[in-house]
UniProtKB/Swiss-Prot annotation:
The gene is surE. It catalyses: a ribonucleoside 5'-phosphate + H2O = a ribonucleoside + phosphate. It is an enzyme of class 3 (hydrolase). It is found in: Cytoplasm. This is 5'-nucleotidase SurE. InterPro entries: SurE, SurE-like_Pase/nucleotidase, SurE-like_sf. A divalent metal cation binds at D8, D9, S39, N90. Belongs to the SurE nucleotidase family. It comes from Colwellia psychrerythraea (strain 34H / ATCC BAA-681) (Vibrio psychroerythus). The keyword Metal-binding applies.
Length: 251
């Protein structure tokens, strides 16, 4: 199996190096990742400037773009025979609503858009000490994907608690939880007394009960959430039809 490995923390981040070292024991792995930290980049693209790929001494390829750019360039030009896209290991969790903003999840999503199964993996914790735990869990899951391939419209979002492997209780298949709204943006001033603004702290869990990714992590389990690329709210189609078809555009 040939893997295209990317991330959103940047090509020099510890997480991608640890994951590469584990995956390369079992698979052929090529790394194409942003040249800088792109956390929160979501599915953004670089459209107004050309992309450049720089080959680094360790064999990784650095791209002056976003995580989505990196996967698109890697799979369409640099390594066109890849079988799987893996994104991570992200520094910090991607739980619940985080997935909407995550460059890690976006990199995996782009892999699916390019016709490949894809996996996003994040280390859930504040200390970032046990990347190896997440790397080993990811490698084991990928091995199972050989015989249990993902449906064409799905990716796997993996979150692993920041604990030693021996303390990990297991793996749970979960749904996304939800957060409370983030705190208000913080207004400050720069040295020239001009107003600047910083995003507030993420909201705490609003829906973090049993069965959610939040609950799994809080109880010492790795969380695996299948995500669909189709954002259609299928359950609402008939209801909206019922009142929208009566709309008279000539009124």
């Amino acid at each position: 199996m040939k893997i295209l490995l990317s991330n959103d923390d940047g090509v020099h981040a510890l997480g991608i190096k640890v994951l590469f070292d584990e995956l390369v024991k079992h698979f052929s792995v090529n790394v194409v990742a942003p040249d800088r930290n792109c956390s929160g980049a979501s599915n953004s693209l670089t459209l107004l400037n050309p992309l450049r790929a720089e080959h680094l001494d360790n064999g990784f390829i650095s791209v002056n773009g976003t995580p989505t750019d990196s996967v698109h360039l890697g799979s369409s030009q640099l390594f066109t025979d890849c079988d799987l896209v893996v994104a991570g290991i992200n520094k910090g969790a991607n739980l619940g609503d985080d997935t909407l903003y995550s460059g890690t999840v976006a990199a995996a999503t782009e892999g699916r858009h390019m016709g490949m199964p894809a996996v996003a993996v994040s280390l859930a914790g504040n200390n970032e000490q046990h990347y190896q735990t997440a790397a080993i869990v990811t490698a084991k899951i990928i091995k199972r994907l050989r015989t249990h391939p993902l449906p064409a419209d799905q990716i796997l979002n993996i979150n692993v608690p920041d604990i030693p492997l021996a303390e990990l209780k297991g793996i749970k298949v979960t749904r996304l939880g939800h957060r409370h709204q983030a705190e208000r943006m913080q207004k400050m001033q720069d040295p020239w007394q001009r107003d600047i603004y910083w995003y507030g702290v993420l909201g705490q869990e609003l829906d973090g009960g049993e069965g959610t990714d939040f609950h799994a992590i809080a109880n010492g389990y790795a969380s695996v959430t299948p995500l669909t690329v189709d954002m259609t709210a299928h359950r609402s189609i008939e209801n909206i039809k019922s009142w929208l078809t009566a709309l008279n555009l000539s009124d």
